């Protein structure tokens, strides 16, 4: 099971969930779950970041919500077609800490030895790019 952020053809943000059965609109599945459980005070969840901030982002949450909604309605109408765009999972991270340069291909590319231990490095939060996003290079 994989969660992802996406926008609809009308640029509305959503959370998607990928299961062996396909990709689904988790934002709408969450709404059905809230209604079924009578969680009227629970917020809508259009962003993965909001799920993280509210401490709802866990495998157990996704499983419980999906299993509950599947028990009373078909998810087929919530299956995603090709009319959506994958977005960055967290749009405004405070920090990006990376783990890398510990595999052979990268070390060879940089003409260096493969480190014995993984290396950590930081990236600017503006370095995130959506799937198939365009990298813009500065002019000049």
What are the residue ranges of the model-derived segments?
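N-terminal non-catalytic cap/leader segment that marks the start of a structured domain
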Residues: 1-118
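Structural signature of FAD isoalloxazine-binding scaffolds in flavoprotein oxidoreductases
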Residues: 114-131
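A structural-propensity feature for long, helix-poor, extended segments
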Residues: 128-140
């Amino acid at each position: 099971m994989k969660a992802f952020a996406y926008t609809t053809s009308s640029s509305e943000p959503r959370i998607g969930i990928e299961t062996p059965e396909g990709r689904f609109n988790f934002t709408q599945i969450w709404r059905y779950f809230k209604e079924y459980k009578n969680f009227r005070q629970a917020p809508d969840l259009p962003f993965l970041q909001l799920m993280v901030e509210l401490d709802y982002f866990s495998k157990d949450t996704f499983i419980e919500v999906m299993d509950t909604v599947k028990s009373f309605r078909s998810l087929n109408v919530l299956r995603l077609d090709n009319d959506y765009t994958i977005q960055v999972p967290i749009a405004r991270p405070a920090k990006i800490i990376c783990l890398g340069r510990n595999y052979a291909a990268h070390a060879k590319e940089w003409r260096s030895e493969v480190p014995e231990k993984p290396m950590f490095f930081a990236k600017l939060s503006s370095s995130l790019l959506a799937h198939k996003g365009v990298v813009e290079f500065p002019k000049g």
